[in-house]
From Swiss-Prot:
HAMAP family: Leu_tRNA_synth_B (MF_00049_B). This is Leucine--tRNA ligase. ATP binds at K622. InterPro entries: aa-tRNA-synth_I_CS, aa-tRNA-synth_Ia, Leu-tRNA-ligase, Leu_tRNA-synth_edit, M/V/L/I-tRNA-synth_anticd-bd, Methionyl/Leucyl_tRNA_Synth, Rossmann-like_a/b/a_fold, tRNAsynth_Ia_anticodon-bd.
Length: 860
């Protein structure tokens, strides 16, 4: 064994061994308990960042630990390879998205291997390959036949100059990111999957997810947004149709003083024919990108349509306004407004001088003061005719019943959740497998024409999708009739909604899933990824699992038993102000800092002499130039050091502050272990441990070893507090470093301790542990070694510490055998000089003894 720890030498050797032995490849084995450990698959952006490293290290630690418990562990990896960034990069680098993507995959695969992650590479998949997306296309056609897929027009961001659809992130301050033209909202036909058909199940089954974070479940509950209310129909004077609204507060209905409709509503369109102001307003709304998140903060605007609706219960005429806070794609495109009891309606009514009618009393029973704001709390009705005096629940039911009896109301359960729009007007995605025949019939692409392959050898102009620009690509024949293929591609959330299931049978050619393999491995035992995926990916992931279950492919209701959301990785951020007042962000690697006595940064500059402003720790990002390249750190310290720091610096679900001093500390710890094993093995062979012949000190050290095994096992396995597990190992290492090594049993005990330490550290730092296990002559490869088991007998304390008090004041602490009687403890206490002097010449009037803990002698 060499004296110095050289990670650059041992890590490449160990990785080569894993590759050659195919150590982490697994197959179904009914004789073994399975464990499926999965980290969210990466987008092949070009380089790994520290967020990836943290996510995948957590997953690898769990997978390696479960493997050492004797389970059949599946830990696969793949690439979420479609998506918009590849199109931008292709244009910028004058290439096509496919070669850019495949080059990135090759580079990042090497980076993952360099970090020593124990993946089953035989199951690697890339979602941009026809071998993968063909099954998604087939499944989509089956969902269409089941009535779960439909096409309707929906609003998109449209650049009139480039004649193309823009993703939300390509709209900057209302303009096209590329040509700065003002963006319009345009209605175009798009494909949808009926996720709303599963809304109740998606909501109710959240209760089955005992090991998912409550925050994620709450976010999904709110996103699904189940509400119970009443749908109410209004007649409108001089208008051919009625208006329908939905409300969750029918108790406030007597306070409805106006209706508001979306700018795109047929009523608003009709009114605009003779109203130039309204026509201009509709035009303005059409050119505004309105995401739901922005609705709450934007200025509320509207124009009176001139139409009057009739309140079904009072018979009063109330105005109908077109308003920018109502969207056609939500509900009916019309809402009832109760300005006395809804703050948004109140602000709008105040702005335009509309009637505000209070109908709910304040909590103290007085009429509400509406001079500053609406009263939004529930309460008792007044000003409501026959419903006066009713509380919220009674009024809800009475008004709902009356409207229903009149034929103008219907109780409804509504959802905030909308059907999933899966059409994207982009190139780099899986083609949607639908065709339109010459006679206008729309139908799924026949099975014998699947997959519909995306051409990869294309020229990108940065404006139009190559498959939209090439009229020949869309041409096909179905049943002998000319037809045109759909040129939209799938939302990339489609691919990431079922990849976890395909990992169970990536080579299967008979269908989407091999049910036997899928049902052996599924559900996933632990799924690891960022909380930013709480409502989009993780909802579609659950939805797809239920679709596959209903298609007979899987037999479980949910895709993952446990979800672990790792915290973000933070780093110091610095900038200097440029000549034009702009902020120039400087990498923390290039910052020369001065610190105070507490280690806080008080001054910083860069190599060019710029005075730097320190903004504190923030999420590693390109925009703040504070990302730390994992590859540089691995080359400097080794993969094991980086992995150990990642797991030790913070609990897995909390933010992690990147500190290179902490990385250096992790590296020093690994060097200490290496040195201890080197010194131990240099002394030659070790005798067998005789546990019956140990001294008290040896027993105490062995007790510490086995208590550490018990704690680390609990911390990793049950609590998943990996940082405290490492801290416990470090504490034990400090004791081992001071332990005597001269005697035969000292060395035998050290051998047992080091074999345990190396196995406990193996999930965290597998390369050094692989090597040290060999040097310690552990049996076989450590990858197949069992997890150490704490010896219950070794942990039993044979002595205990008893506090001795005289008249309630502590006078001594004594060590006694655990089975000592009260008499023996009193006798031992009396031998202590500090106790004896207080007992001299006095009478012990009372003895209070708490066995094994406390002896209090009351004297007088």
């Amino acid at each position: 064994m060499q004296e110095q720890y050289r990670p650059e030498e041992i890590e490449s050797k160990v990785q080569l061994h894993w590759d050659e032995k195919r150590t982490f490849e697994v197959t179904e084995d009914e004789s073994k308990e399975k464990y499926y450990c999965l980290s969210m698959l990466p987008y092949p952006s070009g380089r790994l960042h520290m967020g990836h490293v943290r996510n995948y290290t957590i997953g690898d630690v769990i997978a390696r630990y479960q493997r050492m418990l004797g389970k059949n562990v599946l830990q696969p990896i793949g690439w979420d390879a479609f998506g918009l960034p590849a199109e931008g990069a292709a244009v910028k680098n004058n290439t096509a998205p496919a070669p850019w993507t495949y080059d990135n995959i090759a580079y990042m695969k090497n980076q993952l291997k360099m970090l020593g992650f124990g993946y089953d590479w035989s199951r690697e998949l890339a979602t941009c390959t026809p071998e993968y997306y063909r099954w998604e296309q087939k499944f989509f056609t089956e969902l269409y036949k089941k009535g779960l897929v439909y096409k309707k027009t929906s609003a998109v961001n449209w650049c009139p100059n480039d004649q193309t659809v823009l993703a939300n992130e390509q709209v900057i301050d209302g303009c096209c990111w590329r040509c700065d033209t003002k963006v319009e909202r345009k209605e175009i036909p798009q494909w949808f999957i009926k996720i709303t058909a599963y809304a109740d199940e998606l909501l109710n089954d959240l209760d089955k997810l005992d090991h998912w974070p409550d925050t994620v479940k709450t976010m999904q509950r709110n996103w699904i947004g189940r509400s119970e209310g009443v749908e109410i129909t209004f007649n409108v004077n001089d208008y051919d149709n009625t208006l329908t609204v939905y409300t969750t507060r029918p108790d406030t209905f007597m306070g409805c003083t106006y209706l508001a409709v979306a700018a795109g509503h047929p009523l608003a369109q009709k009114a605009a024919e003779n109203n130039p102001e309204l026509a201009a307003f509709i035009d303005e709304c059409r050119n505004t990108k309105v995401a739901e998140a922005e609705m709450a903060t934007m200025e509320k605007k509207g124009v009176d349509t001139g139409f009057k609706a009739v309140h079904p219960l009072t018979g009063e005429e109330i105005p109908v306004w077109a308003a920018n806070f109502v969207l056609m794609e939500y509900g009916t495109g019309a809402v009832m407004a109760v300005p006395g009891h809804d703050q948004r309606d109140y602000e709008f009514a105040s702005k335009y001088g509309l009637n505000i009618k209070p109908v709910i009393l304040a909590a103290d029973g007085s009429e509400p003061d509406l001079s500053q704001q609406a009263l939004t709390e529930k309460g008792v009705l007044f000003n409501s005719g026959e419903f006066n005096g009713l509380d919220h629940e009674a009024a809800f039911n009475a008004i709902a019943d009356k409207l229903t009896a009149m034929g103008v109301g219907e109780r409804k359960v509504n959802y905030r959740l909308r059907d999933w729009g899966v059409s994207r007007q982009r190139y780099w995605g899986a083609p949607i497998p639908m065709v339109t025949l010459e006679d206008g019939t729309v139908m799924p692409t026949p099975d014998d024409q699947l997959p519909v392959i995306l051409p990869e050898d294309v020229v990108m102009d940065g404006i139009t999708s190559p498959i939209k620009a090439d009229p020949e690509w869309a041409k096909t024949t179905v049943n002998g009739m000319p037809a045109l293929r759909e040129t939209d591609t799938f939302d990339t959330f489609m691919e990431s909604s079922w990849y976890y299931a395909r990992y169970t049978c990536p080579q299967y050619k008979e269908g989407m899933l091999d049910s036997e393999a899928a049902n052996y491995w599924l559900p996933v035992d632990i799924y690891i990824g960022g909380i930013e995926h709480a409502i989009m990916h993780l909802l579609y992931f659950r939805f797809f699992h239920k679709l596959m279950r209903d298609a007979g492919m899987v037999n479980s209701d949910e895709p993952a038993k446990q979800l672990l959301c790792q915290g973000m990785v933070l780093a110091d951020a610095f900038y200097y102000v440029g000549e034009n007042g702009e902020r120039n962000w400087v990498s923390p690697v290039d910052a020369i800092v001065e610190r105070d006595e507490k280690g806080r940064i008080v001054k910083a500059k860069d190599a060019a002499g710029h005075e730097l402003v320190y903004t504190g720790m923030s999420k590693m990002s390109k925009s703040k130039n504070n990302g730390i390249d994992p590859q540089v750190m691995v080359e400097r310290y080794g993969a094991d050091t980086v992995r150990l720091f990642m797991m030790f610096a913070s609990p897995a679900d909390m933010t992690l502050e990147w500190q290179e001093s902490g990385v250096e500390g992790a590296n020093r710890f690994l060097k200490r272990i290496w040195k201890l094993v080197y010194e131990h093995t240099a002394k030659g062979d070790v005798a067998a441990l005789n546990v019956d012949a140990l001294t008290e000190d040896q027993k105490a050290l062995r007790r510490d070893v086995h208590k550490t095994i018990a704690k680390v096992t609990d911390d990793i396995g049950r609590r998943q507090t990996f940082n405290t597990a490492i801290a416990a190992i470090m504490e034990l290492m400090n004791k081992l470093a001071k332990a005597p090594t001269d005697g035969e049993q000292d060395r035998a005990l050290m051998q047992e301790a080091l074999l345990a330490v190396v196995r406990m550290l193996n999930p965290f730092t597998p390369h050094i542990c692989f090597t040290l296990w060999q040097e310690l002559k552990g049996e076989g490869d450590i990858d197949n070694a069992p997890w150490p088991v704490a010896d219950e007998k070794a942990m039993v304390e044979d002595s205990t510490l008893v506090v001795v008090q005289v008249n309630g004041k502590v006078r001594a602490k004594i060590t006694v055998p655990v089975d000592a009687t009260e008499e023996q403890v009193r006798e031992r206490a009396g031998q202590e000089h500090l106790v004896a002097k207080y007992l001299d010449g006095v009478t012990v009037r009372k003895v209070i003894y708490v066995p094994g803990k406390l002896l209090n002698l009351v004297v007088g």
